[in-house]
Curated annotation (Swiss-Prot):
DNA binds at H91, R110, R151. This is Formamidopyrimidine-DNA glycosylase. Gene3D superfamilies: 1.10.8.50, MutM-like, N-terminal. The keyword RNA-binding does not apply. It comes from the Bacteria. It comes from Pseudomonas putida (strain ATCC 47054 / DSM 6125 / CFBP 8728 / NCIMB 11950 / KT2440). Keywords: DNA damage, DNA repair, DNA-binding, Glycosidase, Hydrolase, Lyase, Metal-binding, Multifunctional enzyme, Zinc, Zinc-finger. GO terms for biological process: base-excision repair. Pfam families: Fapy_DNA_glyco, H2TH, zf-FPG_IleRS.
Length: 270
């Protein structure tokens, strides 16, 4: 699943080619995504100029002169720019045609993504209750410490809760906990303020590094400019269960936490 760095990489890839451009037509070949694509999307968006492309959590907000297209990449979706008129292949569900001669093409084999329309996107039900962005000053270790008090759940699903902080998905939660030396199974409410301060720093560092390097390469992810990211080669623990820790050599263990695989080092993480 594309996580926050992958979505931000997509935003950075497509924004320069969309902002200031006028939409000439919207072609929808299959409306059956996680939520159906609005029947009148072509009418609403065609003829409008795209003002900006923003990101909130893992949602992309394509802001037109009136209204916003809210897009989510789901489990395996991607947005990329192609030449106008390029024939569509299987799973290529939407084309947003631009007067520049390019198209923004949405591909989603599993159809678990979304393309919705809103006149007030930040108050849309999907975005309204989201926590702060992890790379802003609204998120820090003190927030983690305060929200964790009395919580018996494991720390990993706690930091993956979008009401606590957005965009800390499985890959980056795993890596940040390793960098902070915290066992992902530990009870969230039992972790000290000092350790949460360290964890928040590592969450910011890991996410910023992934964004800077183009996002993590996953089998189904393609960046907005058609190029995959390349951060996976630097992962310390994610996807490496049973292999030696890159720091101490201890065999990494894999467990299930909240229905997700979690890899950790029993020596480096306490």
């Amino acid at each position: 699943m594309p996580e926050l760095p992958e979505v931000e990489t997509t935003r950075r890839g497509i924004a320069p080619h969309l902002e200031g451009q006028r939409v000439s037509r919207v072609v929808v070949r299959d409306r059956r995504l996680r939520w159906p694509i609005p029947e009148d999307l072509d009418v609403r968006l065609s003829g409008q100029r795209i003002v900006s492309v923003e990101r909130r959590a893992k949602y992309l907000l394509i802001n037109a002169e009136v209204g916003t297209l809210i897009s989510h990449l789901g489990m395996s979706g991607n947005l990329r720019l192609v030449e106008l008129g390029l024939p569509a292949a299987k799973h290529e569900h939407v084309d947003i045609e631009l007067e520049s001669g390019l198209m923004l093409r949405y591909t989603d084999p599993r159809r678990f993504g979304a393309m919705l329309w809103s006149l007030d996107p930040l108050n849309h039900e999907l975005l309204l209750r989201l926590g702060p962005e992890p790379l802003t000053d609204l998120f820090d270790g003190e927030r983690l410490f305060q929200l964790s008090r009395g919580r018996s759940m494991a720390v990993k699903p706690f930091i993956m809760d979008n009401a606590v902080v957005v965009g800390v998905g499985n890959i980056y939660a795993t890596e940040a906990l390793f960098a902070a030396g915290i066992d992902p199974r530990r009870e969230a409410g039992g972790i000290s303020r000092a350790r949460y301060l360290k964890l928040a720093i590592e969450i910011k560092r890991v996410l910023a590094a992934a964004i800077e390097q183009g996002g993590t390469t996953l089998r189904d992810f393609i960046g907005g400019d058609g190029q995959p990211g390349y951060f996976q080669q630097e992962l310390f623990v994610y996807g490496r269960g049973g292999q030696p820790c890159k720091v101490c050599g201890t065999e990494l263990r894999e467990v299930k936490l909240g229905q997700r695989a979690s890899v950790y080092c029993p020596r480096c993480q306490r």
